[in-house]
Structures are given as structure tokens and as C-alpha cells.
Amino acid sequence: MTQAELLQKALETADLIAGGGLLNPEQSDKFITYLQDMSVMAKDARQIPMKAKKREINKIGVGQRASVPAAEGQDPALRQKPNFSKVELDTVEIMTPFEITYDVFEDNIIGENIEDEIIQLFATQIATDHEELYIMGDKTSSDTYLKLLDGWRKIAKTQGHLYDHAGGGVSTAVLGELLDELPEKYLRDYADLRYYVSPKFEHGYKRILGQRPTPAGDKFLLSEEQATYAGIPLVRVPVIPSNLQEVIGGTPYEDLTFVILTPRKNLITGIHRALTLERDKNIFARTRQYAFTTRIACAYEEPDAVAIAEQISVVS
């Protein structure tokens, strides 16, 4: 089943209207799957289904050596205990309102399916909006949408390992510094590590690789070959910006970005299954009005397992 068919099954307009706009469990599951599949960084995350506004996830681990030399007939007198802790997901409510004028229904070239087509477009945009909040959310932001929650960037800066590139340009050194910042215990599952980067950072890094006068360098200029550093893939995330502004050492920058390094399984998203798509009419404005409502949350399972490089100039 294609993504379009999956979404169409999840958002059968007639069924939604009959149900008062509340998606049934099967529709919710399909819509949530669609949202995740249309994302990039969030697609790598472990998605936690939620039936309440908040949910706690139990963590268990052993933080130090637990083995000792064995001696016959002797009690080692040392017993390690697992460490228990919790991650709390606290959802925020998001509404996506939109409207379609009567003229669109009357004069479009798609025909009777125009409503479903437009709803699918907005569903795709919702996936992008969710991922933007997961990554760029900051409760101190002046942006009323982004201030809903602290996202992966903010958590990485405040609870993870921060490397300040101080306005320097795209380079292999940035990725190397991040790898150095990450505690060694998180390098054991090396294959799960990912660098999450902006499209312009990826482009700049591929240009560096492409300067090598070898076939290995050519492939980064001539194909969509995924770039790596020390065997760790770079994942291009369209919603990571490359136009952040900051004054660094008295010099204003308008082309800054950041890079996040973490294991994929360290990323967590939560979404409440009580999703709604409601519809109404404004007969005076001659419009049909719609509202998607969702509740979402995000976290790292272990903030200590993330490193972030800030203040990278993509044109320096």
C-alpha cells in the first residue's frame, strides 16, 4: 500500500464526519504511521503510543563493571544493582486549522476528490510541523509554536554535550569534535549512531569529500551517495535550518546551523491516539473549515548520549 493509499484509508472523510471527527483506533494508527514515515529524524525515533496526556517510560541499566574473579568456596561479597530511572513524556496540543472555499470545489480540475487531495496535503504538512517542533522546540522562544515544548536541540544544549564551533565553517573537524564529545560507553552500539545535519551542511561536507581526486570523491559530486564520517552516516534533515542568526565575537552571522550526534534508539516521540479531524461550514464566507488536533511529545531516553555542535557557518 502506498503512502497516499494509507492516508486515504486513515482519513475517509465520510467516516470522520459520522464519528464526530474523532479517528477510530485503526485510523489513528494508520495516520500516526503516515506522520512518522513522512518525517526524517522523527522516523528514526522510537515512537511511544499514549492513551493519556502524560506517560512515564522506565529505564534500566548497569552503569559499571559487575563481574569479579571467581574463587571456589568464597562469596565475592559484591553485588551490583541495576539502575532504575524514568523518562516523562508530557504532550502538548496542536491544532492545524485550514479552509477551502466553495469556488475551489466548483472550479477545480481534480473533481470530487479535491477535498481528499487537500486534506492529504495538510496531513503531509503536519508531519513536517511535528518534526520542526521535535527538533527546534524551545520554551524560551518568541515563536508561539516553538515555545510549546523543549525539543531535541534544546535538550542537547542543556543536558547533553555541547561543542561550540564559534562561527567556523563546515569541516570534518566539526564531526570529529562531536565524536570526541560523546562518552565512550555510547560508542558500543556504533552502527546505531547518526549525525543529523541540515541540507546545506551536507552539501558543504560533500563538496569537501568531492575535492579528492579519486573515484571515491567523484561519487559525492555525481550521485546521491550518503556521506559518512568515521563510518557514521550523515542524515539530511530538511527542517534543520541553515539561517540561524547570532553575533559571535562582534561579528554578525546569518548562516548558522547545528549538528546532532546520537544513537537512533535514543530519540523518543510520543503521540496521543485521540486524534481528531473536524469539519464545519461558514455559509457567509462560503468556505468549508477544518481542524486537525493532535497531542505530541519528544525526549531523549538518555540525554548524556547526545552531542551537539552549534554555531557552524555554512558559507565560511
Language model features with spans:
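Sequence/fold signature of self-assembling virion shell proteins
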Residues: 2-39, 44-54, 150-170, 177, ...
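Intrinsically disordered or highly flexible coil/loop and linker segments, enriched in small
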Residues: 16, 40, 127-136, 188-192, ...
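Assembly/oligomerization interface modules of large self-assembling protein complexes
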Residues: 18-99
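Short helix/loop capping segments that flank catalytic or ligand/cofactor-binding pockets
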Residues: 66-67, 108, 131, 204-206, ...
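Extracellular structured ligand-interaction cores
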Residues: 95, 192, 287
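Alpha-helical scaffold segments that mediate packing/assembly in large oligomeric complexes
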Residues: 102-181, 311-316
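Ordered core of a single globular domain
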Residues: 177-212
